[in-house]
Amino acid sequence: MAKSLQDVLDNAGNAVDFLRNQQTGPNVYPGVPAEYSNWRNEQRAWAKTAVLFNQSYHMVELMVEGPDAFAFLNYLGINSFKNFAPGKAKQWVPVTAEGYVIGDVILFYLAENQFNLVGRAPAIEWAEFHAATGKWNVTLTRDERTALRTDGVRRHYRFQLQGPNAMAILTDAMGQTPPDLKFFNMADIQIAGKTVGALRHGMAGQPGYELYGPWADYEAVHSALVAAGKNHGLALVGGRAYSSNTLESGWVPSPFPGYLFGEGSADFRKWAGENSYGAKCSIGGSYVPESLEGYGLTPWDIGYGIIVKFDHDFIGKEALEKMANEPHLEKVTLALDDEDMLRVMSSYFSDSGRAKYFEFPSAVYSMHPYDSVLVDGKHVGVSTWVGYSSNEGKMLTLAMIDPKYAKPGTEVSLLWGEPNGGTSKPTVEPHEQTEIKAVVAPVPYSAVARTGYADSWRTKKA
């Protein structure tokens, strides 16, 4: 008899220890090499010239179609759908009945009664569960990420063209001036004789477009973009640099799925299988709460307070209404101290007392990194995504901390490494924990992102 996600958690006994010792590392980025040139130049290209991210392989897609599609997605998301119409997209965020974030994906409003969700699996699975168990007149079609399929063929290709020269490259690829789109608006364009969907979007703290279309057009469109980029310094980005781009733009890629705890998600855990995301995901870092609830994050904690709208009925509305005026963690960037980083790295050349290894450019070693942020030894928040930015010349981390300590310039410390020498994850070697001094900085860290994303959730506060 097939096991459910709840069976897996029950059999594990201590769910925190179970997920912290899962035999899975961080998310992988298949389909592209680790580096096309080297990750330093690839990072610098998105700030200096332009890059082409290939997102065709690592994300899940879920088509949602039918007469109830709009109402269905509206009921599951904290976002307002007021004035939401075909040709627009949004960062779609579902929460549990208790108000904890499950994940986020990009929601494309393609046509009347037709939507596409693109991103990581947790939010996708949540939508599938409610479609399967509710009375919604919707049809869902899942297109699985490459790592979990054998045919290598996707429904759509998906590229991100980003950087100061992105507009010039797109102009050359199209043979005409691209449409002037507002942030998160879409239009159809022509590249190499193919119809291409274009979403005005931004990653890595730089302006640009997300481009997508039928898989059969992959080579023609990709080749045309590469050719157009030759005179504009276009760099292809491999998996190593790709995983670090969020450090400059301020998006938290890995909120712990709130459906893994709480009575309000019990039916989901009984429905989800033993191979579902929640049964396989890993947690890493120095922060070890007593229960999975300790990993839960609210929309405000990760900077999504601005998109919480109570103008519609949705799962978790009552819980969020109660939370709205309560204190929340505040999302910040932590800039790790240069000298302390040199101290940590020098430990790698010692016979004993080695700190947890910092991989470059992304030092994330689990699917859900959670490290403690301390002030005078007191826990004041958690750090998530961590890594090195060649553009900034700093080791950075995205963190959520007590607002009392969130003012830029405040000195804190990051507790780096896991307790008791580390867990059994394959990405963890024996090591000792150490505190690394850090300074609170704005989020996004990139000055371009703070200016260019002025009208988005990345910079606004609720």
From Swiss-Prot:
GO terms for molecular function: methyltransferase activity. Optimum pH is 8.0 (in the presence of 1 mM tetrahydrofolate). It catalyses: syringate + (6S)-5,6,7,8-tetrahydrofolate = 3-O-methylgallate + (6S)-5-methyl-5,6,7,8-tetrahydrofolate. One of its GO terms (biological process) is lignin catabolic process. Its EC number is 2.1.1.-. InterPro entries: GCV_T_N, GcvT/YgfZ/DmdA, GcvT/YgfZ_C, TrmE/GcvT_dom1. Pfam families: GCV_T. Pathway: Secondary metabolite metabolism; lignin degradation. Induction: Induced by growth on syringate. The keyword Methyltransferase applies. Keywords: Lignin degradation, Methyltransferase, Transferase. The keyword Zinc-finger does not apply. Disruption phenotype: Mutant cannot grow on syringate, but grows on vanillate. It comes from the Bacteria. Involved in the catabolism of syringate. Catalyzes the conversion of syringate to 3-O-methylgallate (3MGA) in the presence of tetrahydrofolate. Has weak activity with vanillate and 3-O-methylgallate. Belongs to the GcvT family. This is Syringate O-demethylase.
